[in-house]
Amino acid sequence: MLALADNILRIINFLFLVISIGLISSLLNTQHRHSSRVNYCMFACAYGIFTDSLYGVFANFIEPLAWPLVLFTLDFLNFVFTFTAGTVLAVGIRAHSCNNSSYVDSNKITQGSGTRCRQAQAAVAFLYFSCAIFLAKTLMSVFNMISNGAFGSGSFSKRRRTGQVGVPTISQV
């Protein structure tokens, strides 16, 4: 079973990623030209939901899935993907005012729409929120790996430290 703080961060991150998917899917639905930046953002959100939320649910109930090394790897990849997605979209929209018509008309992501501009800015914000949560979860995974080893889980290591696993001691006989 994963820690309570880890599960709370997973729930909050799930909400941020669902909001990001909604904003990005709206950008994809209203686009006139192809934008690989927006497509990558959708991939990063979908990958984050799949590996963080769904894998986290399974890791709560199936203890062999909760290896600290696997959780660290997935959290680190999610951090990298969401940071890259937020940065790619932020560079693409170049953080101008959405009321500036010359900027909105010339940008490949906003494509002449102030609404698309605001949606892209909101998607960048939620991607960075998600990125911060993935960074916190990566650090938690590192501390878990240091304390429990790369292939041990927290509950198994606690049982081993208290002497409940293996050969019984003389006081248990």
Curated annotation (Swiss-Prot):
Primary location group: membrane
Keywords annotated in UniProt: Cell membrane, Membrane, Protein transport, Transmembrane, Transmembrane helix, Transport
GO CC, any one term: cytoplasm
Record GO biological process: eisosome assembly; plasma membrane organization; protein localization to plasma membrane; protein secretion; regulation of fungal-type cell wall organization; regulation of phospholipid translocation; vacuole fusion
Cytoplasmic side: 1-10, 63-75, 158-173
Segments traversing the membrane: 11-30, 38-62, 76-93, 138-157
Domain of life, per lineage: Eukaryota
Topological domain spans for side Extracellular: 31-37, 94-137
Localization per Swiss-Prot or TrEMBL: Cell membrane
Matching Pfam families: MARVEL
Topology class, membrane: Multi-pass membrane protein
Protein family (similarity comment): Belongs to the NCE102 family.
Domain notes: The C terminus is necessary to target MCC-specific transporters into MCC and for the formation of the plasma membrane invaginations.
Function: Involved in membrane organization. Required for the formation of membrane compartments of CAN1 (MCCs), localization of CAN1 at the MCCs and subsequent invagination of the plasma membrane at the MCCs sites. Involved in eisosome organization and might act as a sensor of sphingolipids that regulates plasma membrane function. Involved in a novel pathway of export of proteins that lack a cleavable signal sequence. It may be an accessory subunit to an essential core component of the non-classical export machinery.
Protein name: Non-classical export protein 2
Native organism: Saccharomyces cerevisiae (strain ATCC 204508 / S288c)
